[in-house]
Amino acid sequence: YEIYKFRKAGLTNQQILTVLEYDETVDQELLLGDIAEISGCRNPAVFMERYFQIDDAQLEKEFQKFPSFSILDDCYPWDLSEIYDAPALLFYKGNLDLLKFPKVAVVGSRSCSSQGAKSVQKVIQGLENELIVVSGLAKGIDTAAHMAALQNGGRTIAVIGTGLDVFY
């Protein structure tokens, strides 16, 4: 919850990761002023003011809309933690156990041709459901990859960068 609150108060994902990394090296609990300084935020006073102005009951309600896990949790995918600017907090819906299986990422154009969709279908069929298909949920190649996997009895993970309750 605290990571979510930091984000809502204005820290970027990278600033939160910096704070979490620093926090691992000290034995005492960090004060909000320390967090503002360590994070490198542009205006610590504004961050702290926003933090204290947050309605905790409302934010908690918003936070509880979907289950989540953070980069500090054991279920956080190791391979995701190795990328630059790994998401500090992820919300999910569905089977979290799919993260434990070998995966293949599929990325492509939102305006794919019928040939592109057929190519994705062929590649996914060739995987013979040995890998979990990971892709966005945008139209085009992303959707074609998910559909091909599901039509062939496979499993998928959809990554939505905007959040589970934001539609575009």
Predicted segment positions?
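Short, positively charged patches
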Residues: Y1-Q125
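Generic beta-strand structural signal
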Residues: A88, P102-V104, L131-V133, G154-R155
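Phosphate/pyrophosphate-binding betaalpha-module
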Residues: I124-Q125, I132-Y168
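Short active-site oxyanion
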Residues: K65-P67, E130-V133
